[in-house]
Amino acid sequence: MTAALAALGVMWASQLAPPTSFTVAASGDFLIHGPVAAQALSDGGGRRYDFRPLFRPIRRHIAGADLALCHVETPLVPGPVQGYPSFRTPPSLAQAIRATGWDACSTASNHSLDAGQHGVNTTIRALRLPHSGTARSARGARRAPILRVKGARIAFLAFTAVSNGQAVPHPWSVAWAGARRILRDARRARRRGADTAIVNLHWGDEYSHAISPSQWALARRLTRSPAIAAIVGQHAHVVQPIRRVNDKPVVFGEGNLVSNQTAGCCPAASQDGLIALIRFTARNGRVRARRVRYVPTWVRHPDYRVVPAARGSVSWRRTVAVAGRAAWLRPAR
């Protein structure tokens, strides 16, 4: 009798245990055009590429999160730097990523194979962080990172829905975004001990704020899964809306974090981005996204600093008008 009562006490205590809360920061494209790399070279005294100053203005938002996720769109490859249309980015970008406070990065994009499998390999080697979306082997492709955050175990899964038509070295080199594949990988992560998954998708139509029909369809299907808690996305190079789909947050497009895109070549909004700050609660292995705050960002020229957009500025108003406001969603103060 005493043992039974003790067991019940343990069970009730676990049920009554307060939930833990944590914040995940997710940001937009690192799109390292030639002029951005040239600024990093200047910041490095002309001897090395130092990208750290570009991100110092937003460091508190990245380092201040419990988990920070970045999106490396272009391959990190030693040797001559190349910009658009076939990128080769200095590997020292990875040093800036780590110094700014990002904890893991997605690497699946339409530029993942700009330098072939070699570029995939050198990117992963340079990052020295958990990554998802590209792989050096079939085994690596099957093992998405599971990240520990305040006792919760979060799988990070990344995929691209778009490519530039490059030859694919191996079936496992880049993770392609199909609903069945994504759901399979999310379930596999659950079997490996993950409580839930955050899915990063490189998707949508370039320079369009509108959510495409294919984005809507994929978001609806994925958010029906109990194995997925939230979706974040990039590729459009402009901000896209943040919505609740099946009661889960979907950040359809975070815009560019850093690039050389301006109104001179592209929409003025290509200088805009956002850092999504998703607040989760975890209790007894159940993880749920409760609310989203976001930091509108802007790429300042000519020094390419990524700065929080001034409240009420043209950039801030553009981003807020697209990203949206709701009881669970608002720009951060």
Predicted regions and their residues:
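Bacterial N-terminal signal peptides that target proteins for export
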Residues: 1-4
